[in-house]
């Protein structure tokens, strides 16, 4: 399977009631609504989990630069999810590992645009962790994803 390039990857249509869709955003009463993520998710179904995914293409070439790596990483996650029968709206958790928190924070607008281009406006629970480095020395971001496909 080859990895699609982001511009050709349309946001997959959201399935309204696939098997009694049972993914629900958890928003405690009185808490401010988060922007770009959820406080928590509740789901019932078959779990699809990725490993740590980085921004290399189907030929093993790492994208150049932080935003390009994020884009390719999210595309790669979409491909892995599809392979497991999952769609973007099935995502319940993303854990981001970055080597430069300042670079991430300076790119929030662009990151949001890239995210929505690939996954639409579905925002699962997310965590962001700064690390000293990643296994692939030139990688600037690595993301793990968990999805739950309704039964």
Residue ranges of predicted features:
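N-terminal presequence-like segments and the immediate start of the first folded domain
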Residues: 1-92, 98-151
């Amino acid at each position: 399977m080859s990895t699609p390039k982001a511009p050709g990857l349309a946001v997959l249509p959201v399935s309204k009631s696939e098997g009694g869709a049972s993914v629900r955003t958890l928003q405690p009463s009185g808490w401010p609504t988060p922007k770009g993520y959820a406080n928590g998710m509740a789901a019932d179904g078959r779990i699809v989990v990725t490993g740590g995914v980085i921004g290399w293409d189907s030929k093993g070439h790492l994208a150049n630069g932080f935003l390009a790596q994020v884009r390719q990483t999210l595309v790669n996650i979409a491909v892995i999810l599809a392979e497991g029968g999952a769609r973007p709206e099935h995502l319940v958790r993303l854990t981001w590992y970055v080597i430069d928190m300042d670079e991430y924070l300076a790119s929030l607008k662009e990151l949001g645009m890239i995210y929505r281009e690939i996954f639409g406006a579905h925002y699962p629970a997310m965590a962001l962790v700064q690390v000293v480095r990643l296994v692939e020395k030139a990688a600037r971001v690595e993301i793990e994803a968990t999805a739950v496909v309704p039964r």
